[in-house]
Amino acid sequence: MLSRRTFLEIAAASGLAAHLGCSVGPPAKKRKKLAIIASIWKYLSHAQHFGDRFLVGYPRKGRWHHPEMDVVSLYVHQKPEGDQSQARADEFGFQVYPTIREALRCGGDKLAVDAVLLIIEHGDYPRNAKGQVLYPRYEFFRQVVEVFEQDGRAVPVFNDKHLSYDTAKAKKMVADSKRLGFPLLAGSSLPVTWRIPAIEFPLDCVIEEALMVGVGSSDASDYHALEAMQCMVERRRGGESGVKSVQLIQGDAVWKAGEEGRWSKRLLEAALSRSNKLLGDTLIDARPQDLANNGQLPKIVKEPAAYFIEHADGLQSTLLMLNGGVQDRTFAAKLQGEPEPQSLLFQLPPIPNVTYSACLAEKIEEMIETGEAPFPAERTLIVSGILDHCLESKVQGNRKLETPELQISYRPPEGSHFCRA
């Protein structure tokens, strides 16, 4: 039992500690410092989506969540009309620096941040003959790595979307992270957004065939669709084993390939059964449609494309880009031992809130707090390489290409990382 004298001694000590500015409880957690390296920061740019979530927070598990970290520095490569970078800096008290090195060192001579967010998406950049936007992700990443090397310290890095449009450059980025020992999280929000239904394949399941339906432009939206498909098929027996060959075909050849069985009409039916945004006759009189089987797709999809991926372990996966047929992204696969395909919709909430960005912000925050990326950068690496080689197939007359460069194997995370309702 606590005596009065002992109680008074404890109380007096506590009061003295408080008077001296000390804490008698556990020390306050030190807030992490973030540097953002961006192509642009304006309304609806990716830098705005992710940057704002670290500045003002985001919804998580029924509450408004404020990350226990601060944006302290920013570098923006371009400042077009509508630029928000300086306004955000003024409002939230961080500095916009003229170079990447200064942003990482906060104007000093040593690395002064605990993590780097590399968000090089959107902006005015040229395209090459394959239609790839030449975003300087690799070049900016290299500047970050050079600071790590010069200052003798490396911190976690998030890279938004592709690692690079060039497979060789993308490989160097992953190699640098392993050489210097810093966690690298890369990719888009598709693997972590909501799924309807909330399906996650069991690890080491046997997938017989997979098909993804995507929409949008190249090389932004086909990347999204390929990555969404990859996060599903990587959970098969043995994990990802690499890609043996790819081929991209277009136009009527896509429908002919379906008739010949190169892609599964049954899987297309299963995928489209999850779509919330069917086009064609549905827009005219609201009728339900079996677009996989009613013969309408060739009439309403003017420029179809099929991306065929032959994995090293024999799995065949296919992306169908069906602009004009649907306006959302769905997936289906046939698992061994299951009588029917499993299928789902990757749910993307609308602009301007694009809440799916919060799902990825949570994973970025997790990496910064734990020092470990929640899923491997090799997923983004292999998807970057698949897209690069599919677009090479396109410019080479849609021929099949062997891909020894894509013998990239990895194991998926054991846990499930997508948002759930």
Name each region found by the language model.
Residues 121-191:
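Beta-strand-loop-alpha-helix segment that lines the small-molecule cofactor/substrate pocket
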Residues 1-2:
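N-terminal secretory signal peptides
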Residues 6-24:
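N-terminal export signals
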Residues 214, 224-351, 358-378, 387-391, ...:
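Contiguous beta-strand/loop segments that form the cofactor/metal-binding neighborhood of enzyme cores
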Residues 117:
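N-terminal Rossmann-like NAD(P) cofactor-binding module of classical short-chain dehydrogenase/reductase
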Residues 34, 183-195, 202-218, 240-252, ...:
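NAD(P)-dependent dehydrogenases' Rossmann-like dinucleotide-binding region
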Residues 95-103:
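Short acidic-hydrophobic, aromatic-tinged amphipathic segments that line or gate anion-handling sites
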Residues 22-91, 210:
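N-terminal Rossmann-like dinucleotide-binding module
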